[in-house]
């Protein structure tokens, strides 16, 4: 049963915060690639960033240790889902085009529809079918329909696609959670990100988990610690609103990342963004809008 939350200032503030958080994620690829270029390819960039954030938050972890330990199982489960989403997404940013990574991540309306049918027992309406078809067609266009077989072309594509699946389920669980402080959810998210990244380092092979000298990590850490000034507000503005807003609305509001990410990738990195990418973007965004506004009409 959906939790009752007043549509007053709290939801408005959360919505504005999420739009800002999404826009901040839109330039997240820049520090990820800078760290990767420092000799930390694949999953290593994310490991350094999430580790730096946890180091900064150590005092908060210590102060809240009793509360964290009392609900560690719940936090670990949700932290694994949300952490996996952004661990995979972070890794994808250094292994495929930024635009492809962002668009493949934002197929969340498709996964949200499937989760609603399978987990929440929701009905399959015309609006939902339309959103599903639009999202899948947008995916095919982005992956090269008409030019080549529309299939993820590299490991980065697969990681971005998988990250959106984890986020769809993770944001649903965040919304369903009992009242747990957003700060604790952020800590769980960071721990989950580090945990999943560590697992990838163990089993990912040379492409994802190349051997790195400890000195390279130590050299990158001051930069990563400085970046937490930017990263921690971004993480909070992603996790906190997701505990208050319905998952469909979260997916739509976070799409401010698409606008910022696509523009910065085209301007700064010179990545291609032509008619095919624009069409895919419109279709995926339209699928998300159909999902949220169509759901409102049927409730």
Language-model regions, residue ranges each:
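Helix-helix packing/entry segments at the starts of transmembrane helices
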Residues: 16, 48, 102-107, 174-193, ...
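Hydrophobic transmembrane alpha-helices of multi-pass small-molecule transport proteins
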Residues: 127-146, 276-293
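Transmembrane alpha-helical segments that form core, pore/gating elements
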Residues: 18, 22, 26-34, 57, ...
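Loop-to-transmembrane-helix transition segments
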Residues: 13-21, 61-88, 132, 155-163, ...
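Membrane-interface helix-cap regions at the ends of transmembrane helices
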Residues: 4-5, 53-69, 137-150, 193-220, ...
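Hydrophobic/small/kink-forming positions within alpha-helical transmembrane segments
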Residues: 26, 30, 79, 83-87, ...
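Specific transmembrane alpha-helical segments of multi-pass solute transporters/efflux pumps
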Residues: 27, 65-100, 105, 141-142, ...
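C-terminal transmembrane-helix exit sites in multi-pass transporters
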Residues: 61-64, 108-133, 259-278
């Amino acid at each position: 049963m959906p939790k009752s939350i007043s549509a007053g200032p709290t939801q408005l503030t959360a919505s504005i915060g999420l739009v800002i958080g999404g826009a901040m994620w839109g330039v997240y690829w820049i520090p990820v690639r800078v760290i990767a270029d420092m000799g930390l390819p694949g999953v290593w960039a994310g490991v350094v960033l999430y580790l730096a954030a946890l180091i900064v938050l150590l005092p908060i972890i210590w102060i809240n240790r009793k509360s964290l330990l009392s609900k560690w199982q719940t936090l670990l489960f949700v932290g694994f889902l949300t952490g996996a989403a952004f661990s995979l997404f972070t890794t994808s940013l250094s292994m495929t085009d930024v635009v492809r990574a962002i668009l493949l991540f934002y197929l969340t309306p498709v996964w949200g529809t499937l989760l609603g049918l399978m987990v929440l027992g929701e009905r399959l309406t015309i609006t939902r079918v339309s959103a599903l078809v639009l999202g899948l067609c947008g995916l095919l266009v982005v992956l090269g329909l008409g030019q080549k077989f529309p299939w993820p072309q590299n490991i980065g594509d697969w990681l971005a696609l998988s990250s959106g699946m984890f986020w769809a389920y993770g944001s649903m669980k965040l919304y369903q959670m009992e009242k747990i402080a957003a700060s604790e959810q952020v800590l769980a998210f960071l721990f989950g990100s580090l945990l999943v990244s560590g697992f990838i380092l163990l089993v990912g092979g040379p492409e994802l988990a190349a051997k790195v000298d400890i000195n390279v990590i130590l050299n990158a850490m001051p930069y990563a610690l400085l970046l937490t000034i930017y990263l921690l507000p971004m993480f909070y503005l992603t996790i906190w609103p997701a505990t208050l807003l319905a998952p469909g609305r979260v997916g739509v509001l976070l799409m401010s990342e698409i606008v910022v990410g696509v523009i910065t990738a085209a301007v700064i990195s010179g990545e291609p963004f032509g008619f095919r990418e624009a069409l895919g973007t419109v279709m995926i965004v339209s699928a998300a809008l159909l999902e949220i506004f169509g759901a409102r009409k049927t409730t």
